[in-house]
Design a protein with these regions (language model features):
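Short beta-strand elements
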Residues: 38-46, 85-92
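Short glycine-/aliphatic-rich beta-strand segments at the starts of folded cytosolic domains
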Residues: 4-16, 20
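Ordered, soluble secondary-structure elements with a strong preference for glycine-centered loop motifs
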Residues: 17-25, 68-69
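Short amphipathic alpha-helix segments
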Residues: 21-39
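Short, flexible turn/loop "capping" segments at secondary-structure junctions
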Residues: 1-7, 48-52
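C-terminal structural segments of small proteins and small subunits
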Residues: 60-94
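A structural signal for short, well-ordered beta-strand segments
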Residues: 8-12, 55-57, 89
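Short, charge-patterned binding micro-sites
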Residues: 44-61
Length: 94
């Protein structure tokens, strides 16, 4: 059975983020959410610019449609739970 992997790369406007610790604090709800999921991996890029944050997620599963639905759910979750706005995104199958 083939594994399906979907890479989601996001750059977000995150107000009041001006250091690595503030970036981690702004994304802490996402870190907690991903920790509770068995099929999602998260990596946060080091702080680079004021009010900006970049991170990548990998959604893993056996069924391509389920991975796609989980990815869409994850993006909706980020949009509603993280204070900020998506500036750029790149979503691809691995």
């Amino acid at each position: 059975m083939a594994m399906q992997l979907r890479l989601i790369q996001l750059e977000m406007y995150l107000p009041y983020v001006s250091s690595n610790s503030e970036l981690l604090r702004a994304l802490s709800p996402l870190k907690r959410y991903c920790k509770e999921q068995h099929n999602i991996a998260l990596t946060i890029e080091d702080f680079d610019a004021t009010d900006r944050g970049e991170f990548s997620l990998v959604v893993i599963g056996n069924n391509k449609r389920n991975v796609e639905q989980e990815s869409e759910h994850l993006l909706t979750w980020i949009e509603t739970k993280i204070t900020g706005q998506t500036l750029a995104s790149n979503i691809s199958w691995l």
